Amino acid sequence: MDRLQEALAQCGRLVIDGSMSTALEHLGCKLNDKLWTARVLAEHPEYVKEVHLQYLRAGADCHITCSYQATVPGLLENGFTAPEAAEIIRRSVRVFREAREEWWEREGGRESGRVYPIGLAGIGPYGAYLSDGSEYVGRYGVDDETLRAFHESRIRLLLEEKPDYLLFETMPSFREVLIAAELAEKSGADYWVSFSCLDGKHICEGDEIRQCAETLSKGHPHLKVIGVNCVKPQFVESLIHELKAGCDLPVIAYPNSGETWEPVQKIWYGGAEKVSFGEHARRYYAAGAAAIGGCCTTVDFHIRQVAEVRRAFAG
């Protein structure tokens, strides 16, 4: 029984953390930068650790490292040397590990009755490196070898720090997911996959998510979880049903709070959903999701709502 199975056996349902970027902004960090959260990881890792601690205290069981935008080519293009880039990427796993141990040993985590927190090494798509909103579109215009080289270097560096799982997240392209899965399978590492989606049935490049789940779940023994993230809350119930119809893997969802992303100015606009995030979580768990969390524009407040719903749901 692996870490995920143990946690699900203990709790029935799990809670994923919330947005790293929004929480960092609330701490005063400026993120209008091509490296986005990776700039903070490089220059002020203490803020990243504080965000992890906030989500640990809020009740999250599964935590994503601050490595979504931390890529070797991106760091090199922004003035870091190759050794510095490698260190920054590896640091993302260590910073979470430090926060986890501090919470577990010094803040009562061990006595809380909660599961030992799961660390997910976050890996964003090629579109995140482009920093132009392509993670919501796909169709990058590059060949398979370019995608393979892009993902291989970061996978290798993250695995040197032995995270619990790799997490390929906000993936708009099924072709890219298959390449990433091939690399993870070759490494022998267990991994999760989470898609960005157009609507309640299709990933951003237009493929039916049910078919993606059906295809991906065959011949990939190290794939442990499939899900969606960075999507509008109103699409999630349908997406959960589609994923569950396509495979037997645990399904996760961590949507945005409801705003829309503007990639040029790098801002979110529009009001958040009037329905509470906790009420959304209740419906997602009822639809069969194994774990729920938040993506962009969510903070520890939202995750506390999810954790409260999970407790009631499990009870």
Placement of each model-derived feature along the sequence:
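Domain-level signal for soluble alpha/beta catalytic cores
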Residues: M1-G315
